[in-house]
Amino acid sequence: MSNTKSELFEKHPEWILQCKNRPLSTGRGGTQIVLDLTNPEVQDFVFSVIDNLMTQYPAIAYMKWDANSCMLDYGSPYSPKEKQSHLYIEHHRGLNNVLERIRAKYPQLILQACAGGGGRINYGILPYFDEFWTSDDTDALQRVYLQWGVSCFYPTIAMAAHVSADKNHQ
């Protein structure tokens, strides 16, 4: 992900998912945008950000991979016209490529997957993450039901959770 008010967007607007001849759609705050992971240059960039962090700060033991935005624009400036219908699949393949590289170089790094709604977890992403954040709802009673429901489909050891004060729904 990126932001329309970032150096990355200024230097590489072609690295953002966007529909040709349409205004750019944005997420939270009116500035959030999604990187085009079908593009190998973008994959390299994302890996380099993590690699640089891990090189500069080798004591990092945990990282939360928060992708709290859905794909707002179903268009890739990188992909040819005949491949646009495969955007979602190719985007996830690009993400998998990045995650494979991170896992290969930093196997000790604990990674937590986190994203909005149904984009939070899927079976294809589980091999790359040690755990996933199931919900921002931290009310203790609601969390019991939420964790129980998710456990019907995913291994409980992979579900991260914490609870907060009573009547707290974040």
Predicted feature locations:
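Active-site-proximal beta-alpha loop/turn segments in soluble metabolic enzymes
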Residues: T31-D36, D73-H86
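An active-site-proximal structural segment forming one wall of the substrate-binding cleft
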Residues: L35-W65
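Active-site-proximal loop/turn and secondary-structure-junction residues that shape catalytic pockets
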Residues: M1-N3, A67-D73, A115-G119
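Glycan-recognition surfaces
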Residues: K5-D44, I89-Q170
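Catalytic grooves of carbohydrate-active enzymes
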Residues: Q56, A61-Y62, A67-L72, A161-Q170
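Generic secretory/membrane-interface signal
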Residues: G30, I60, K64, M71-D73, ...
